Amino acid sequence: MRRVRRGDTGEWHMYELIQVSERDYYIQSPAKIGLVRLNAQDVCLIDSGNDKDAGRKVRQLLDANGWRLTAIYNTHSNADHIGGNKYLQGQTGCKVYAPGIECSFTRHPILEPSFLYGGCPFKELRHKFLMAQENDAQLLTREALPDGFEILPLPGHFFDMVGFRTPDDVVYLADCLSSRETLEKYQIGFIYDVGAYLKTLEMVKTLRAAMFVPAHAEASGEIADLAQYNIDKVMEIAERIVDICREPICFESILQRLFTEFGLNMSYEQYVLVGSTVRSYLSWLKDTNRVRCGFEENRMLWERA
């Protein structure tokens, strides 16, 4: 186990336990897993990783430290954040809590690929990266939190996503922003509600904490600059879409142009993730009068307003 402090940089090994305060930790993984000591024996998790194997590695860390898992607090229901729930709940009997609509998605994971695809998902969309195993989640309420915890609403990336502030003033930020490296590589990060996402990022810029732990960026004592970088990237994508819509164009052609111009590779997974996000951009741009849409020869076409 290592300790990270403000200003620290370094390479962490996958599933290494990193301490960020007296009682707060995270487990280095594709989507960081928060761990908070509640007393000498009991701990809770903030998210659980992307699958059974992640859950197994978390269990090994718990056993190595003599800790007992009492609860998992899910920030939202994306598969890479709830994938370890079923295994850990089965092994430890811990409770699982998820906020709002996310609780339904956590209890019924088929909802995620169905929502992304817009219909019954075919088998190539029913895999662990888009659909976790079902688990017995309860609705997250303030009463379900350990003493001193605070819920931070972070809507935008997904329906009812939240973060948490702990008694040691550590803020776990879930997926409300991504690292510069991630955005430079993938360009179009997943967003459900662009307007809400931008408002969340503006709020995050004002936050102060002893340490911030985003799921897809390095832990840091400062977050405002990275939040602004994410805002700038959203605006860049939005402007690119508006430019593509100079002439009437259908959704599939917009998506093709974006993949080609950003050098992205199409796959089933990327089609639904980026495709859903581009639809969300179009909705936001339409509602803010940047683009309009209509029908021609039984096709919906988008055009700059």
Regions found by a protein language model. Give the residues of each.
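Short, Lys/Arg-enriched N-terminal segments with co-localized hydrophobic residues
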Residues: 3-13
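Divalent metal-coordination and catalytic microenvironments
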Residues: 23, 36, 47, 76, ...
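Metallo-beta-lactamase
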Residues: 50, 150-236
